[in-house]
């Protein structure tokens, strides 16, 4: 199953810059765990996590259901990139 495409379909309407979102899925050696890393701009990361993590938890639940069909445990992680030392 292409977890990267599923995540893109879910988040493209949420983020401001969908073309700058990087998604990488890495499967464990035992084949039962998959770690999906979503990296995007700081503001988009905040949108994906949502207030009190509501959106992130919903995304994790949806992707977990997809993983259950293949007996896989999915871990969804978020990271941001961009200008770290922004000067005013």
Label the model's feature ranges.
Residues 1-46, 55-58, 62-88:
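RNA-contacting regions in translation and RNA-metabolism proteins
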Residues 49:
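The feature captures the beta-strand-to-loop junction immediately N-terminal to the Walker
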């Amino acid at each position: 199953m292409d977890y990267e495409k599923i995540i893109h379909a879910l988040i493209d309407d949420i983020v401001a810059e969908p073309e700058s979102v990087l998604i990488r899925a890495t499967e464990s050696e035992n084949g039962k765990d998959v770690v999906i890393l979503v990296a995007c701009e700081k503001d988009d990361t905040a949108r994906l996590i949502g207030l009190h993590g509501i959106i992130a938890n919903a995304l994790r639940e949806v992707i977990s259901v997809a993983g259950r069909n293949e007996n896989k445990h999915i871990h969804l992680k978020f990271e941001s990139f961009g200008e770290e030392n922004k000067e005013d």
